[in-house]
């Protein structure tokens, strides 16, 4: 009986540590979200790269990275945003 109690205690401690470890990994992962979009079209020659926001964000978005290392949120349904994304994909 004592062996099974000790084994159960070890199992519970191991589960608690694994759960703690996986929770801390998820908390350290940054998620970039857009809460508003740029109201102006950015000149295409200013754009160096882009990425899409996470599905965990409340609004979908495309984040353009400028050549001056700034991040600009844009509405993915805008025609110019789709063109820039397409052009960046073709040049990659």
Swiss-Prot record:
Disulfide bonds join 33-57, 34-73. One of its GO terms (molecular function) is phospholipase activator activity. Induction: By TPA or PHA (TPA = 12-O-tetradecanoyl phorbol-13 acetate (tumor promoter); PHA = phytohemagglutinin (T-cell mitogen)). One of its GO terms (biological process) is cytoskeleton organization. Pfam families: IL8. Changing residue 70 to A: Reduces heparin binding. One of its GO terms (cellular component) is extracellular space. It is found in: Secreted. Changing residue 49 to A: Reduces self-association; in BB-10010: Improved pharmaceutical properties. Changing residue 89 to A: Reduces self-association. Residues 1-23 form the signal peptide. Keywords: Chemotaxis, Cytokine, Disulfide bond, Inflammatory response, Secreted, Signal. The record marks 40, 68, 70 as: Involved in GAG binding. Belongs to the intercrine beta (chemokine CC) family. Monokine with inflammatory and chemokinetic properties. Binds to CCR1, CCR4 and CCR5. One of the major HIV-suppressive factors produced by CD8+ T-cells. Recombinant MIP-1-alpha induces a dose-dependent inhibition of different strains of HIV-1, HIV-2, and simian immunodeficiency virus (SIV). Self-associates. Also heterodimer of MIP-1-alpha(4-69) and MIP-1-beta(3-69). Interacts with CCR1. This is C-C motif chemokine 3.
